[in-house]
Amino acid sequence: MALPILLDCDPGHDDAIAIVLALASPELDVKAITSSAGNQTPEKTLRNVLRMLTLLNRTDIPVAGGAVKPLMRELIIADNVHGESGLDGPALPEPTFAPQNCTAVELMAKTLRESAEPVTIVSTGPQTNVALLLNSHPELHSKIARIVIMGGAMGLGNWTPAAEFNIYVDPEAAEIVFQSGIPVVMAGLDVTHKAQIHVEDTERFRAIGNPVSTIVAELLDFFLEYHKDEKWGFVGAPLHDPCTIAWLLKPELFTSVERWVGVETQGKYTQGMTVVDYYYLTGNKPNATVMVDVDRQGFVDLLADRLKFYA
């Protein structure tokens, strides 16, 4: 039986590839997709979800737009990474369908209510929508199997020295998620920076030769440009968000640890930092499964294998 999932995302090149991977995987049943502001403005990330589902011929999946700004802060976007549209690079189709006439939280709540079994929430942007769902629908917590997020880091940040972008955009929301008591799985920079796609991997995807694998290669062509900056020391482009989906499909590709994670919302230099109690110094009970390593080649092979689905 396929695992029911709700996908909350802010596409975003790597979010788009996470959608591609999820919908190529019969092990997963994507019940709905909601959009959050983050990599681009809320209007653009919603449009990008619709464009991707139009490309993938999955206009049957309900879509709703989410919060237009973080819980307590002004919105920050990553247009320097993802371009003016949020998905610069390939020529994507215009949407052929409309989002639901409801908010992301309403669609999430409806999906949870109607599911016969608990649903896994996969959140690859800021945690705003998920936090709003948790706060407004405590009666539905038992319908959530787990929350798998791309965000945070045990070590270095990528938006500030201490903070990863998704958590930095809305640290208050992330704190709500980590404190919820629901199992959380964290794909932070410690693992996603090891999930790099090299130029030869992109060419492998392109050579698969179907329309979707070609678009994925073109997304990666654009995404790689930002990551060529010497300051990162990368060989390729880190494919952050698909790590969440890959973990659901093949957890054996990942090394993870159970630890307590807190989110810094006040710090002078550390706002948005995920504080991971690696050495059990706080006495707090672990509240998260934290991914720390990945079999990079296995990850690339999984992507290549699933891209053939779209032939």
From Swiss-Prot:
GO terms for cellular component: cytosol; protein-containing complex. Keywords: Glycosidase, Hydrolase. The keyword Signal does not apply. Its EC number is 3.2.-.-. GO terms for biological process: nucleobase-containing small molecule interconversion; protein homotetramerization; purine nucleoside catabolic process; pyrimidine nucleobase metabolic process; pyrimidine ribonucleoside catabolic process. The active site is at residue 240. InterPro entries: I/U_nuclsd_hydro_CS, Inosine/uridine_hydrolase_dom, IUNH, Pyrim_hydro_RihA, Ribo_hydro-like. PANTHER family: INOSINE-URIDINE PREFERRING NUCLEOSIDE HYDROLASE, URIDINE NUCLEOSIDASE. Hydrolyzes with equal efficiency cytidine or uridine to ribose and cytosine or uracil, respectively. Strictly specific for ribonucleosides. Belongs to the IUNH family. RihA subfamily. HAMAP family: Pyrim_hydro_RihA. This is Pyrimidine-specific ribonucleoside hydrolase RihA. The gene is rihA.
